[in-house]
């Protein structure tokens, strides 16, 4: 299907209600609003998320009359996926069309595990200096169907053996484009679908929300959802974090750590422990005393530390710390009793590694299109 036909199809679909926008409670309300019983929502959700069915006529345990009604009123439509790329290490990346712009989604198969890295916004407003996404500016929050549709569509490809991945998606990480906590409502609705027994029925321990630390949203997150939490800290003090992450001038390290403690107090996911993400930048944040500072920051919080070798992108002056420096940094923390992992670089050759995701984004702040390849 060419883009003109696709856009015409999407215009027609916009007149219908996209059921991918509904978690179970919203689906029940919708079914009641069209004169149907609540339990029909459960039946339809199972068809959508456990049989990957987007054709109401194939939902054989509901009446023909209801199937016709749903076909008239509703659709099951994820965003369009283009430009499927496969890395030498097996990592896969897609461009995902959002209007006339696009985001990126990455699938990482490894042994018996398949991890999907999804985006939550079209662009990102945080402008972290070491991240390519942040250089593109921000356009909009993704809606629920655009978030859950990334998981649903790739899971459907695997389910029907349309791509060379054997195991279904076991882990979802919100580590793609955008800051999830700046799109809190839509992200939470999508997470509820992933967790629901009539939805994707995933474990909360296998879903990770990664945030730069939007403190007001982080403080109330526990009242809305319980999933594993990762926080992009990337510095051992506020001076460095201000340089790397402008959001730190609004929500400094101390306020972020306080919000983390509150979330962990209520959360049962991931053994009540936060993952601290720390990008390794040569001469910036990788000295031995930075490791000491990091330990002192975190010693009152149950945590594990994920050291991330920085991935180069054009136009950046940063340099990744070398392997010796990264290992020395890790060993300092390990000797103090920290759990430390060093992230393995996946998908670098197709620009699918951490910090490399881009797309086509119309930056609303500067009123221009940013397209980085």
UniProtKB/Swiss-Prot annotation:
InterPro entries to which the protein is assigned, alphabetical: Aldolase_TIM, Methyltransferase_A, RlmN_N, RNA_MTrfase_RlmN, rRNA_lsu_MTrfase_RlmN/Cfr, rSAM
Radical SAM core domain location: 110-349
Cofactor note: Binds 1 [4Fe-4S] cluster. The cluster is coordinated with 3 cysteines and an exchangeable S-adenosyl-L-methionine.
Residues binding S-adenosyl-L-methionine, per UniProt: 178-179, 210, 232-234, 311
Cofactor(s) needed for function: [4Fe-4S] cluster
GO biological process, one term: tRNA methylation
Gene Ontology CC: one annotated term: cytoplasm
E.C. number(s) listed in UniProt: 2.1.1.192
Domain of life assignment: Bacteria
Described purpose of this protein according to its UniProt entry: Specifically methylates position 2 of adenine 2503 in 23S rRNA and position 2 of adenine 37 in tRNAs. m2A2503 modification seems to play a crucial role in the proofreading step occurring at the peptidyl transferase center and thus would serve to optimize ribosomal fidelity.
Protein name (database record): Dual-specificity RNA methyltransferase RlmN
Organism: Buchnera aphidicola subsp. Baizongia pistaciae (strain Bp)
Lineage, highest ranks first: Bacteria, Pseudomonadati, Pseudomonadota, Gammaproteobacteria, Enterobacterales
Gene that encodes the chain: rlmN
């Amino acid at each position: 299907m060419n883009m003109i036909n696709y856009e015409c199809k999407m215009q027609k679909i916009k007149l219908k209600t996209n059921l991918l926008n509904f978690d179970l409670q919203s689906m029940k309300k919708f079914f009641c609003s069209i004169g149907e019983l609540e339990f029909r929502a459960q039946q339809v959700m199972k068809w959508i998320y456990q049989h990957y069915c987007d054709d109401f006529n194939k939902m054989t345990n509901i009446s023909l009359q209801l199937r016709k009604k749903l076909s008239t009123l509703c659709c099951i439509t994820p965003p369009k996926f283009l430009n499927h790329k496969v890395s030498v290490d097996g990592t896969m990346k897609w461009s995902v069309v959002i209007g006339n712009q696009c985001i990126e989604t990455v699938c990482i198969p490894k042994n018996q595990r398949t991890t999907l890295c999804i985006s939550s916004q079209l662009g990102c407003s945080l402008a972290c200096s070491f991240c390519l996404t942040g250089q593109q500016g921000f356009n909009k929050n993704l809606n629920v169907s655009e978030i859950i549709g990334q998981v649903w569509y790739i899971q459907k490809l695997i389910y029907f053996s349309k791509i060379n991945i054997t195991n279904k998606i076991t882990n979802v990480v919100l580590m793609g484009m955008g800051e999830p906590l700046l799109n809190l409502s839509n992200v939470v609705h999508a997470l509820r679908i992933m967790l629901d027994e009539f939805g994707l029925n995933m474990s909360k321990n296998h879903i990770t929300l990664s945030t730069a630390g939007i403190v007001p949203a982080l403080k109330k997150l526990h009242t809305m959802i319980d999933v594993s939490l990762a926080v992009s800290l990337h510095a051992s003090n506020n001076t460095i974090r201000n340089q790397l992450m402008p959001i730190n001038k609004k929500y400094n390290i101390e306020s972020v750590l306080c919000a983390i403690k509150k979330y962990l107090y209520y959360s049962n996911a991931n053994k009540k422990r936060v993952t601290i993400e720390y990008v390794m930048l040569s001469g910036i944040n990788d000295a031995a005393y930075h490791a000491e500072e990091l330990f002192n920051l975190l010693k009152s919080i149950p945590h594990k530390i994920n050291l991330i070798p920085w991935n180069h992108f054009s136009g950046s002056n940063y340099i990744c710390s070398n392997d010796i420096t990264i290992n020395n940094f890790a060993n300092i923390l390990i000797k103090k009793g920290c759990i430390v992992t060093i992230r393995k670089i996946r998908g670098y050759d197709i620009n699918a590694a951490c910090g490399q995701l881009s797309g086509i984004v119309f930056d609303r702040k500067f009123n221009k299109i940013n397209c980085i390849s």
